[in-house]
Amino acid sequence: MGLLAGILLVKIAPEEQKPLRRYFEWMRKLILLLIFLFPGFYYLNNPIYIIALLIYLVFIIFVEYKLGSLLRKSIIIYTALGIIFYLSSKNSNLFAIESSLIFLHGVPSASLMFSKKEKNYPEIFISNLGFLLVAGLAYFI
């Protein structure tokens, strides 16, 4: 839903996409950090979870800074967010926070990826199907 909101934001106010680009990039990175920070607080007394979460965060930071295309970054990041989404479902408070943050992460991500000239919204949704697949498969396994 966050991706849809981001695309709608650019469709409604396309003239704001370029001036807000820098802020969208910072907001996307900050929200991504918060997505990893809240489970860290929840699992604070379990060092194994903290270490796994830190390794996971380092991997996401590596992807963030080494891949050039935002669409390719999004494929990996949203697949990883699907795992966090599933793991947070065990605690309703953490699940509400993580769900909200994943939604909020989708708004600037889609706003940065969407091109009104190219009309690439199918590519955006297809490249982020990893989130739905991972979260759905993890739920049924």
Task: Describe the predicted segments one by one.
Residues 1-50, 123-141:
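Alpha-helical transmembrane segments and their cytosolic membrane-interface
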Residues 19-26, 71, 91-95, 121:
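Hydrophobic, aromatic-rich alpha-helical transmembrane segments
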Residues 47-117:
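Membrane-proximal helix-loop-helix units in multi-pass membrane proteins
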